Amino acid sequence: MSDADVATEAPAALPGDGLREGIIDALRRDIGEGLVDTHLMPNDDLWIRVATDAWRAAAASLHAAGFDYFCYLSAIDWMPSPYGRGEDDPTQPPPERTTEIKQGYAGGETRFQMLARLTDTKRHVGVTLKADVPDDALAVDSWIPVYAGANWHERETHEMFGIGFNGHPDLRNIYLPTEFEGYPLRKD
């Protein structure tokens, strides 16, 4: 085969992923406009961003679709750290810091996002669910009615980030003293 033959061949198409594409389609049918964005890595992983008001409905839809294992639930503060990165050289002047927020796979529009990982143990497929949490209303609906195991995850997220969970029966602190002020995992 000559170099000319190689240059004229069409590039190979990326493989499809019918299983994960089907999950996206089913969730879109269930929550409609509540599905905001997706990031599919064929035959590897799936990230889905939903609207804040569709957070619990998305969990219920995925649970009904066979996602029987609740892995974790937490939040992330996408604000760039005012202290730099841990690998910055302390002997050098500090690098210029950016204030641009980058939300990772499936995008985002707010500083805080909820993250949760669910797995369908029969089909051996997982999905990471994300939801933007508006700065002026730091709360989402609790997942306890859908996944009872979300209880302490939500308590920890509330304690560390200050995000509320509508319908949660008991948002007492787990780690910090009752009189502790502030939220340790916020970057401000």
Regions found by a protein language model. Name each.
Residues 1-188:
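Terminal low-complexity/charged segments
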